[in-house]
Structure formats: C-alpha cells, structure tokens
Amino acid sequence: MDQEAVGNIVLLAIVTLISVVQNGFFAHKVEHESKTHNGRSFQRTGTLAFERVYTANQNCVDAYPTFLVMLWSAGLLCSQVPAAFAGLMYLFVRQKYFVGYLGERTQSTPGYIFGKRIILFLFAMSLAGILNYFFIALFGSDFENYIKTVTTTISPLLLIP
C-alpha cells in the first residue's frame, strides 16, 4: 500500500484498533465478574452485578457493527478527520454507557442518547459522500470541499451534551 492510500485511512484504522482494545476491556470485565462469583468457569447467569456487566457488554457488542460501518463509510466517502473525531467521541460515550450501566441504569441513558447522535452524524456524513458521488457522475459538480468544510465545522458540536 502506498503512503497516500495509508494516509487516507490511518485515522480510521487507529480508531478501529482503539475500539478493539475497548471490546477486550469489556470482555475482561465480564470474565472477571463471572469468575469472582462463579468460581473458575464462565457462566451466563449469576449475581445482579454479573447480569449488569454481561448486559452492558452485550448491548455494546450489538451496536458495534453499525458503528464500524458508519465510521468507515463516513471516513472513506466524506472526510477522514471528522469521522475519526466522531469515532473517538463514540468510544468515550460507549465507555460512559458501559460504566453507567454498572451503576444505576439511568446513569447509562446519557451515554446511549449521545451515542445515537454520533451514529446519526456519521450516517449523515456517509450520505453526503454518496450524494456527492452522484452529483459528480450526473451533473459534473463536485461539492467535496463544501462537505468537508461543513463536517469539520459541525463535528466539534458533538461535544455539546
């Protein structure tokens, strides 16, 4: 792979690798909680604490494929930097959701809502990239610079709760 191609995806790859480490952390928490209360073997049922850790992990795993598709679609079709920034924000929010779910379930709600907003932003970026492709193919008009400017300007607004 040449340097330019790698430069176009390196931030997305970094965010993806960080998300893999986070998944490992979540799985370790489930395993640790299972072994703490069930001895040496892993069991899917147990104490309330284990049920919370297991459910929080399962909820994060369920949303993970959608996150990866939106991250890479937005980064490849629109702009890498805002997509990677939104991806990092999503990982922080997912951590907040996971930790919040271990306490009161209402503590996980802000992370869940914020995560949905970030996924929607990544979806909008992907859609803008697809529309730009068709504008180029059909009309010869390239709006890529405008789209990159708008997404780069809007992405810091994701920090507002």
Swiss-Prot record:
GO terms for biological process: leukotriene biosynthetic process. InterPro entries: 5_LipOase_AP (IPR001446), FLAP/GST2/LTC4S_CS (IPR018295), MAPEG (IPR050997), MAPEG-like_dom_sf (IPR023352), Membr-assoc_MAPEG (IPR001129). The chain crosses the membrane at residues 9-30, 53-77, 81-102, 116-128. It is found in: Nucleus membrane; Endoplasmic reticulum membrane. It holds the Pfam family MAPEG. Residues 1-8, 78-80, 129-161 are lumenal. Gene3D superfamilies: Membrane associated eicosanoid/glutathione metabolism-like domain (1.20.120.550). It is a multi-pass membrane protein. One of its GO terms (cellular component) is endoplasmic reticulum. The keyword Secreted does not apply. Homotrimer. Interacts with LTC4S and ALOX5. This is Arachidonate 5-lipoxygenase-activating protein.
